[in-house]
Swiss-Prot record:
Inhibited by UTP. Its main location: cytoplasm. Belongs to the UMP kinase family. ATP binds at K20, L21, S22, G23, G61, R65, Y175, D178. It comes from Arthrobacter sp. (strain FB24). UMP binds at G60, D80, A141, G142, L143, P144, Y145, F146, S147, T148. Gene3D superfamilies: Acetylglutamate kinase-like (3.40.1160.10). Keywords: ATP-binding, Cytoplasm, Kinase, Nucleotide-binding, Pyrimidine biosynthesis, Transferase. Homohexamer. This is Uridylate kinase.
Length: 245
């Protein structure tokens, strides 16, 4: 298995990133999909594709949040599956706008739905990226109780991404405290996973951080707000907070 992994790494000549987009990004702060918002994000991704191989994991919070639905009395597993289906709707919306922007795109789903998406196969995803296509991963891990942050870390490791890019709404990086509650909170340009876990920083999922730490994968937490931030993050420009092992 090690030989296969090494051969994949040696074949990879361009920077390869895994971009995590929250469901809230697709809704523009509302329920459902906001076409103008998704079109804008797609254009930013398209601008970076000629230079970088891009895979994307999307959330589904603009439709359903399994944990919140379960608090209302719904079975957690069933609620999580509803959330997974919501991510696939976001995948299809982003695929449409990326292809309108001239970027070949493939959707891979962890839950089989052959009419709208390919099955999730890591090696096929890698080949798509090598051919200049964007790959969007939907349906989370295909299992309940896994956040899409954790799925982003897992997919990044499976497709041998160089970095995980966590795009956030309403915050431009990691702070010493919640900047909305503490006016003295300071933004951190760099942070180790050990420090983030010790401080119990909640801007990203702790399981995802542990997975990245254990596998020496760098994460960048950055804000969606700001002209061209997604393009800049994909290209590797300095912004947000860099979290390293």
């Amino acid at each position: 298995m090690e030989t296969v992994n090494n051969s994949v790494q040696s074949e990879k000549s361009r920077r390869r990133v895994l971009l995590k987009l929250s469901g809230e990004v697709f809704g523009g702060g509302k329920l459902g999909v906001d076409p103008d918002t998704v079109r804008g994000v797609a254009k930013q991704i398209a601008a970076a594709v000629p230079d970088v191989e891009v895979a994307i994991v999307v959330g589904g919070g603009n439709f359903f949040r399994g944990a919140e639905l379960s608090q209302s009395g719904m079975d957690r597993s069933r609620a999580d599956y509803m959330g997974m289906l919501g991510t696939v709707m976001n995948c299809l919306a982003l695929q449409d706008f990326l292809e309108q922007a001239g970027v070949e795109t493939r959707v891979q789903s962890a839950i089989t739905m052959g009419q709208v998406a390919e099955a999730y196969i890591p090696r096929r995803a890698i080949r798509h990226m090598e051919k200049g296509r964007v790959v969007i991963f939907g349906a989370g891990a295909g299992l309940p109780y896994f956040s899409t942050d954790t799925v982003a870390a897992q997919r990044a490791l499976e497709v041998h991404a160089d970095v995980v890019l966590m795009a956030k709404s309403g915050v431009d990086g990691v702070y010493t405290a919640d900047p909305k509650k503490d006016p003295e909170a300071e933004k951190l340009d760099h942070l180790s996973y050990d420090e983030a876990l010790r401080r119990d920083i909640r801007v990203m999922d702790q399981t995802a951080m542990t997975m990245c730490k254990d596998n020496n994968l760098t994460m960048v937490v950055f804000g969606m707000e700001g002209e061209g931030n997604v393009t800049r993050a994909i290209r590797g420009e300095q912004l947000g907070t860099v979290v390293t092992p």
